Amino acid sequence: MNFQSNISAFLEDSLSHHTIPIVETFTVDTLTPIQMIEKLDREITYLLESKDDTSTWSRYSFIGLNPFLTIKEEQGRFSAADQDSKSLYTGNELKEVLNWMNTTYKIKTPELGIPFVGGAVGYLSYDMIPLIEPSVPSHTKETDMEKCMLFVCRTLIAYDHETKNVHFIQYARLTGEETKNEKMDVFHQNHLELQNLIEKMMDQKNIKELFLSADSYKTPSFETVSSNYEKSAFMADVEKIKSYIKAGDIFQGVLSQKFEVPIKADAFELYRVLRIVNPSPYMYYMKLLDREIVGSSPERLIHVQDGHLEIHPIAGTRKRGADKAEDERLKVELMKDEKEKAEHYMLVDLARNDIGRVAEYGSVSVPEFTKIVSFSHVMHIISVVTGRLKKGVHPVDALMSAFPAGTLTGAPKIRAMQLLQELEPTPRETYGGCIAYIGFDGNIDSCITIRTMSVKNGVASIQAGAGIVADSVPEAEYEESCNKAGALLKTIHIAEDMFHSKEDKADEQISTIVR
């Protein structure tokens, strides 16, 4: 174990900072993020992971607990509620609240060589669009879900899957009015809390680990599933979008439907299964005020790192082959598919425009164009669009410029969003929005909220869509949206079977295989 913080450094840091990290780092060989969370009795706020062994993006897991600040949108304004002082700050824009946080709390960040050492983590819902683009109206139906919810946690566990290093970070908070002895008391109290947390990790608590063959489960039927769309109404709206395309209003529109299914499994059980069934570069479990979010997204929205901007447009998909030869054949087939390539080119143009609005003139480039990247179950055509953030432009402005992703709206983006607000019967909530971390250092990583479940009061909500173009067949587009939801319904089916329907049998089958 390597203790990186000492009281002398803490006292020196306290002269210019009010929020100071206490850090301990050690290396593990068997302890995993899932085991850690079970040892904490699942009393966490979020888990962010990258889990796809074939992807170069997969390396870290971040566990946040003990939130001290909650940021959310309320009636067009953003508020930050401090759980300790019970104070409340409000501002007109998200970046205003984040600037207030950094100025007020005077946060020092540890230098650990990892991409995230603390900050605001949560979601921006699709329904936030009218706050960013006033020409897009709010949906006519109400939703009880906040348009934005971000948590700033006192404690962060950062797990490096490559080095097996685990960093425990505890942010000690000062007011700036303490005496030296009072500062020492704060240090010792936070150090003790950190030690207690680490001791829980060393606990020999028996953790039940999943043993399952995900391939043995077929995608379940939709018998117990309800939708906000009748099939005939969905197909009629496909025809309406095609008429708008024919009239020249848009080139593409992404029409979606929301499925709901009653469940017995809890959200973390769903997450444990999802990370096996559908591992992806962006995986997340979040415990909100009144619901939980579970997701596995393959697609980045935007990445901001020290002023470097990056978007990875994804469009064009094939399933992985059974062997190398079939994989290669499918890659060639995908790259010859003119429809898939045309959609991809459109998304690259959208990404260039999104970055161009906030980038230094002449800095936008496409260093990788139409590259095929393989994931665990599928392969995608992916490009990389980059730029350099303009001086004086806030990193959150880059996030807002890219939000929402064109892959979930269509193009041109604004007109497509206007039409979708008219056609879709209910607000999208998280679907098509983003999950993001906004670091204390201003760096951001975010993914598009797809392949995601929202769990509330024993009901899982799943939304999936289809990209409508001029020659779309309504029946096929309806089936595509159902097929996309099927992967998550499969997750629910497995979790119910493993944890609830056959609990006695499950206990016998549980063994160490996947962490």
Curated annotation (Swiss-Prot):
Binding site for L-tryptophan: S50, P281, Y282, M283
EC number(s) from the headed UniProt entry: 4.1.3.27
Catalysis: reaction(s): chorismate + L-glutamine = anthranilate + pyruvate + L-glutamate + H(+)
Keyword DNA repair (UniProt): no
Binding site for Mg(2+): E343, E480
Taxonomy, superkingdom: Bacteria
Matching InterPro entries: ADC_synthase (IPR005801), Anth_synth_I-like (IPR019999), Anth_synth_I_N (IPR006805), Anth_synth_I_PabB (IPR005256), Chorismate_C (IPR015890)
Disulfide pattern: none
Pfam families reported for this sequence: Anth_synt_I_N, Chorismate_bind
Subunit structure of this chain's protein: Heterotetramer consisting of two non-identical subunits: a beta subunit (TrpG) and a large alpha subunit (TrpE).
PANTHER family to which the protein is assigned, alphabetical: AMINOBENZOATE/ANTHRANILATE SYNTHASE, ISOCHORISMATE SYNTHASE MENF
Similarity-based family: Belongs to the anthranilate synthase component I family.
Name of the protein in question: Anthranilate synthase component 1
Gene: trpE
